[in-house]
Amino acid sequence: MESTLELTKIKEVLQKNLKILIILPLLFLIISAIVTFFVLSPKYQANTQILVNQTKGDNPQFMAQEVQSNIQLVNTYKEIVKSPRILDEVSKDLNDKYSPSKLSSMLTITNQENTQLINIQVKSGHKQDSEKIANSFAKVTSKQIPKIMSVDNVSILSKADGTAVKVAPKTVVNLIGAFFLGLVVALIYIFFKVIFDKRIKDEEDVEKELGLPVLGSIQKFN
């Protein structure tokens, strides 16, 4: 019975503050939409892959050893891709449109465990630029690693052409997140409003706050 009364009380409080529950989430939603569509710059990510591949041979045991050796070299090659030498060469390949430090901030290098694949990911504000930069990294890396390591076991597996996708801002996530944030703020506001509002508004408040029985009430006349 007591829990039912509490739920009824909560329902009444929410109904009395319905405007706040509607206005604040909508306000947060509108602000998020403005920031997402008009303030934040879009980011596009393009991907390309290079393969650390074994030389051709007829000896299965030798080939298996070379595959394992190439897998171990992948981590070294990942660091080479991010090295100043590669960054400088890519910057030159792009006619110095981007500085090496800027290229470094756009670049992410990953690989799947126990594979000979290196994934080159590039993020920029333009779809075509992301693809062009990713392709340049793949091209320069495949040319420079043989010179640096004195081995010829790197090739471009896939180019970035047509791979660029928009990765930021995440419109749906931003809008939904802003709406629920506004809802939480509204509920917190209502909670503190109820906690700190000590005004006596009805007979129940008189009995609860003053501990006095209500003998009668005077109707309000207009």
Swiss-Prot record:
Say if the entry is tagged with keyword Transmembrane: yes
Record localization: Cell membrane
- GO cellular-component term (any): plasma membrane
Keyword terms of this UniProt record:
Capsule biogenesis/degradation, Cell membrane, Exopolysaccharide synthesis, Membrane, Transmembrane, Transmembrane helix, Virulence
Membrane topology note: Multi-pass membrane protein
**PANTHER family in the record, alphabetically?**
FERRIC ENTEROBACTIN TRANSPORT PROTEIN FEPE, TYROSINE-PROTEIN KINASE
Give me the segments passing through the membrane.
20-40, 172-192
* NCBIfam families found in the cross-reference section: polys_exp_MPA1
Protein family per UniProt:
Belongs to the CpsC/CapA family.
Q: What does this protein do?
A: Required for the biosynthesis of type 5 capsular polysaccharide (Cap5/CP5). Might act as the chain-length regulator.
In its UniProt entry, what is this protein called? Answer: Capsular polysaccharide type 5 biosynthesis protein cap5A
One GO molecular-function entry: protein tyrosine kinase activity
Q: InterPro entries, alphabetically?
A: Bact_polysacc_biosynth/exp, CpsC-like, LPS_length_determ_N_term
* Species of provenance: Staphylococcus aureus (strain Newman)
- Record GO biological process: polysaccharide biosynthetic process; polysaccharide transport
